[in-house]
Swiss-Prot record:
GO terms for molecular function: metal ion binding; phosphatase activity. Its cofactor is Mg(2+). This is Acid sugar phosphatase. The keyword Cell cycle does not apply. CDD domains: HAD_Pase_UmpH-like (cd07530). The gene is nagD. It comes from Staphylococcus epidermidis (strain ATCC 12228 / FDA PCI 1200).
């Protein structure tokens, strides 16, 4: 296995599974930390702040820091502030998205006359929220969604994800949003910019082919698939572009790196 200078790492299915630890995850991060290898956690979860993400990782005995976390909310806020500083935004989403937008100097408004509509996962979404978003998009607001995931794994099973919520507005208006999170290149490009390395020096680590592995492929970096989450080894063998590597778990990756 190639020794990379840095890694971009998925969370759910790679570092943990729901509220359960994944064997090899904490050990892999310890290996990176002990060898001073930079890494970022890249997540489509827009509901949590980097501090909250770090707290969960630490509960899983993973030694993480907030400045190592790149959420779809952060990538969205940066993208808008670069395009249109001080823009007005109508948002549907959680605390993580609201914090990211306001920290970026964007003004959140509760009406349909805004520069941008941003939709992130909102477990308390209402018809009224969707109505305001729909009217704002019809009025000409730029339409952005933090991530396209149509379902998310929960203890009860697979529940509607942000892509499902976003689809209500896109179907009603006939306008497709610009997606920021994996597998789209915007969140990955931001992560690569933070690392400041050549693409050939960085690998993406994740379990889900359509999201994690494709995010790496879409920006031209190597990919490491771990068989600890959604996509099985058999799943990835049928893909037109397979990942660069596929391991049973991150313990195997460590063993390969230590050869």
């Amino acid at each position: 296995m190639k020794h990379y200078q840095a890694y971009l790492i998925d969370l759910d299915g790679t570092m943990y599974k729901g509220t359960d630890e994944i064997d090899g995850a904490a050990q892999f991060i310890d290996y990176l930390n002990n060898n001073h290898i930079p890494h970022l956690y890249v997540t489509n979860n827009s509901t949590k702040t980097p501090v909250q993400v770090t707290e969960k990782l630490r509960e899983m005995h993973i030694d993480a820091k907030p400045d190592e976390v790149v959420t779809s909310a952060l990538a969205t806020a940066d993208y808008i502030s670069e395009q249109h500083p001080n823009a007005t935004v109508y948002m549907i989403g959680g605390h993580g998205l609201k914090t990211a937008l306001t920290d970026a100097g964007l003004s959140i408004k509760n009406d349909e006359h805004v520069d941008y509509v941003v939709i992130g996962l909102d477990e308390k979404v209402t018809y009224e929220k969707l109505s305001i978003a729909t009217l704002a998009v019809r009025n000409g607001a730029k339409f952005i969604s933090t991530n396209p995931d149509v379902s998310i794994p929960k203890e009860r099973g697979f529940l509607p994800g942000n892509g499902a919520i976003t689809s209500v507005v896109s179907v009603s208006t006939g306008i497709q949003p610009e997606f920021i999170g994996k597998p789209e290149p915007i969140i990955m490009s931001k992560s690569l910019d933070i690392l400041g390395l050549e693409k050939s020096e960085v690998a993406m680590v994740g379990d889900l082919y359509d999201t994690d592995i494709m995010s790496g492929i879409n920006v031209g970096i190597d990919t490491i698939h771990v068989q600890t989450g959604v996509s099985t080894y058999e799943d990835i063998q049928s893909k037109e572009i397979p990942p660069t590597y596929s391991f049973k778990d991150l313990n195997v990756a460590i063993a390969e790196l230590e050869k």
